[in-house]
Amino acid sequence: MRLLERARKEWFMVGIVVAIGAAKLEPSVGVNGGPLKPEITVSYIAVATIFFNSGLSLKTEELTSALVHLRLHLFIQIFTLAFFPAAIWLFLQLLSVTSINEWLLKGLQTVGCMPPPVSSAVILTKAVGGNEAAAIFNSAFGSFLGIVVTPVLLLLFLGSSSSVPFTSIFSQLFMTVVVPLVIGQIVRRYIKDWLERKKPPFGVVSSSVLLMIIYTTFCDTFSNPNIDLDKFSLILILFIIVSVQLSFMLLTFIFSTRNNSGFTPADTVAIIFCSTHKSLTLGIPMLKIVFAGHEHLSLISVPLLIYHPAQILLGSVLVPTIKSWMVSRQKGVKLTRPTV
């Protein structure tokens, strides 16, 4: 009985285990072109649902105030698209003297050059109770920015260049991010009183969508023949990726919690996730365009295929810890405020 109660309370963590297990048993169900059609249901419907859900749940004034938080936007975008790839490049200079496959290392560099994802950072920020409005803006803005910046970074660090279909990617992002968010805000204006009275489970909806994303991502990972590497290389790359993620999460936490940073605990949560997450849905198509016909494309893609599920899993596992820190920090701020 107590076990069932615990499982109900931790339903999301149980859901992650079930999703990964189901993906391992029958990955063909959730791969692109499979029965679930994730190229439509995830890339379009799931992402649109997340941002429509956010549009419904967020107060308009919260979105407006997030737009003018320039310091936060600059921090996230500079960290993601400048510091991250540069730091990875320096790290790879050390790893280049090891026996690790050079194309896997180049794949790690491509991870550093990728834009942030449009969904996972938003969902995790919402799950913690952080600054969701800031996460939405930076995920969307970073994705749009990455369409232009990422090919330039790949050219700079790897010497690879190709024409990217900016128009089609821009239109997909606009239709799945901007339009649902605006529609959600418009609908909210008409049912605001009902929303505040009933308090629908927006967090549960977002978390359920994330479970679907986790499931289809692992279906792709388990069914991908390109990940047929020796176990040592896979374990080593996985260890490096998790170490990089944890190090950068810690780094963003340290920078954003300094006394003179000007960031609230809720801002810090958005910064941690938005600064360290990288997009698979934008990343893989970009790699296929930029490295079209390259004989080592499969190896170059492996680190990103591992990084994406790893960031979702790591973020999901850390949600209770980060939430506990944020709540205690917010209580501390309230207690130290002078009473009038």
UniProtKB/Swiss-Prot annotation:
Membrane topology: Multi-pass membrane protein
GO CC terms, sorted: endoplasmic reticulum; endoplasmic reticulum membrane; Golgi membrane; plasma membrane
Extracellular domain ranges by topology: 32-37, 93-116, 160-163, 223-234, 292-298
GO-annotated biological processes: bone development; heparin proteoglycan biosynthetic process; intracellular calcium ion homeostasis; sodium ion transport
Keywords (A to Z) from UniProt: Cell membrane, Endoplasmic reticulum, Golgi apparatus, Ion transport, Membrane, Sodium, Sodium transport, Symport, Transmembrane, Transmembrane helix, Transport
Organ and tissue specificity: Expressed in heart, brain, colon, lung, liver, adrenal gland, stomach and ovary. Also expressed weakly in small intestine. Expressed in skeletal tissues.
Keyword Zinc carried by entry: no
SS bond list: none
Cytoplasmic side: 1-10, 59-71, 138, 185-201, 256-270, 320-340
Transmembrane parts of this sequence: 11-31, 38-58, 72-92, 117-137, 139-159, 164-184, 202-222, 235-255, 271-291, 299-319
Top-rank lineage group of the source organism: Eukaryota
UniProt cross-references to Pfam families, sorted A to Z: SBF_like
Primary subcellular site in the record, as a coarse category: membrane
Entry GO MF terms: bile acid transmembrane transporter activity; symporter activity
Record's subcellular location: Cell membrane; Endoplasmic reticulum membrane; Golgi apparatus membrane
Disruption phenotype: Knockout mice present with skeletal dysplasia including growth retardation at birth and at 8 weeks, alteration of long-bone morphology, craniofacial anomalies and advanced tarsal maturation at birth, associated with enamel defects. The proportion of heparan sulfate (HS) in cartilage of knockout mice is significantly reduced compared with wild-type animals. SLC10A7 deficiency has no impact on skeletal muscle heparan sulfate levels.
RNA-binding listed as a keyword: no
Alphabetical list of InterPro entries matching this protein: Na+/solute_symporter_sf, Put_Na-Bile_cotransptr
Annotated function: Involved in teeth and skeletal development. Has an essential role in the biosynthesis and trafficking of glycosaminoglycans and glycoproteins to produce a proper functioning extracellular matrix. Required for extracellular matrix mineralization. Also involved in the regulation of cellular calcium homeostasis. Does not show transport activity towards bile acids or steroid sulfates (including taurocholate, cholate, chenodeoxycholate, estrone-3-sulfate, dehydroepiandrosterone sulfate (DHEAS) and pregnenolone sulfate).
Family statement: Belongs to the bile acid:sodium symporter (BASS) (TC 2.A.28) family.
Protein name (record): Sodium/bile acid cotransporter 7
